[in-house]
């Protein structure tokens, strides 16, 4: 499928609105996230690889905050356990509509993929069924901080023995020098990918009120408080990381 280049913040805006996963963002999202999140393609593809180690036959695999379904597609490519199915959940109608188009395109190119169900829902209100794998790829950071432990508790409760949560997030750092250095390097990554200073500044203004990153230690302690017994970081590139949490 074709997507448009991300030029959402290329012109000066009199007032920068809060970032939202609307039709404008859905249209450019593949370009936006590839140019904004270092290591994103590696994270997505390897979530599929890792998921294959935890998926159990006849169980659900959740992609919570699925956006355009990149993780769902990776799960379908890599998980071969018989009877598994992917549940892709997002609360944005615009994102989910395009997600369905991408999944349909995947179906037309490959045979014997896992079945996938798309669900428009708020994951905070979603009744999670038993699952062997839950993936949240840059989703928790958009959940109100006071609701994050509650959500992780629900996920922990839903996971079957031998299952796992794979959680990817942007990080902040308690050490000011480390936080500043990795922040500056992330800006350099964006510039190298063609974003102007205006685009970077306006995107930051749009997203700073809706995305609240945590530190790696905050993630670890919250996951343990939610009932997970082990938290293992498996990937980090600059200030973006992915963790495996075992129930």
From Swiss-Prot:
Single GO MF descriptor: S-adenosyl-L-methionine binding
Root EC class: transferase
GO biological process entries: tRNA wobble uridine modification
Superkingdom of origin: Bacteria
Family matches, as InterPro entries: CmoA (IPR005271), Methyltransf_25 (IPR041698), SAM-dependent_MTases_sf (IPR029063)
UniProt-listed Gene3D superfamilies: Vaccinia Virus protein VP39
Keyword S-adenosyl-L-methionine recorded: yes
Subunit structure: Homodimer.
Family of the protein in this entry: Belongs to the class I-like SAM-binding methyltransferase superfamily. Cx-SAM synthase family.
PANTHER family xref list: CARBOXY-S-ADENOSYL-L-METHIONINE SYNTHASE, TRANS-ACONITATE 2-METHYLTRANSFERASE-RELATED
Physiological role: Catalyzes the conversion of S-adenosyl-L-methionine (SAM) to carboxy-S-adenosyl-L-methionine (Cx-SAM).
Protein name per UniProt: Carboxy-S-adenosyl-L-methionine synthase
Organism the protein comes from: Azotobacter vinelandii (strain DJ / ATCC BAA-1303)
Name of the gene: cmoA
């Amino acid at each position: 499928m074709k997507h448009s280049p991300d030029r959402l913040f290329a012109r000066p805006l009199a007032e920068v609105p809060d970032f939202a996963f609307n039709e404008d963002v859905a249209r450019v999202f593949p370009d936006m996230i590839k140019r904004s999140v270092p290591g994103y393609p590696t994270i997505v593809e390897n979530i599929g690889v890792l998921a294959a180690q935890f998926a159990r036959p006849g169980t659900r695999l959740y992609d919570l905050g699925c956006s355009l379904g990149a993780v769902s597609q990776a799960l379908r490519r890599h998980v071969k356990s018989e009877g598994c199915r992917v549940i892709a959940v997002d609360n944005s109608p615009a994102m989910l509509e395009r997600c369905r188009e991408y999944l349909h395109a995947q179906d037309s190119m490959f045979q014997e993929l896992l079945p996938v169900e798309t669900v428009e829902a708020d994951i905070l209100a979603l009744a999670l069924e038993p699952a062997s794998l839950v993936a949240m790829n840059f989703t928790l950071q958009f959940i109100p901080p006071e609701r994050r432990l509650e959500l992780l508790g629900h996920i922990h409760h839903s996971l079957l023995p031998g299952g796992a949560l794979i959680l990817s997030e942007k990080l902040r750092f308690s050490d000011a020098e480390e936080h500043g250095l990795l922040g500056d390097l992330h800006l350099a990554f964006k510039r190298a990918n063609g974003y102007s200073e205006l685009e970077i500044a306006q995107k930051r203004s749009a997203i700073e009120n809706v995305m609240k990153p945590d530190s790696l230690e905050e993630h670890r302690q919250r996951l343990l408080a939610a009932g997970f017994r082990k938290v293992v970081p498996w990937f980090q590139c600059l200030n973006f990381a992915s963790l495996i949490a075992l129930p």
